[in-house]
Amino acid sequence: MLDKIKHEDILELRLARPPVNALSPELIALLHQSVRAAPDSGARAVVISAGPGLFSAGLDVPA
């Protein structure tokens, strides 16, 4: 759902919820938790990214 990749003092949080990286409540909570914890892990910056093609289609809205 969320890959955490450390690049020295930069933490990359890569969305990994194919096919469109829709933001579910669980993913939003995980993003929030990861950003809040980043300084404790030595990160001086956080970059939120996704795989090639599509960053995110937005919120995961039930039909």
Where are these regions (language model features)?
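Conserved CoA-thioester-binding segment of acyl-CoA-metabolizing enzymes
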Residues: M1-G51
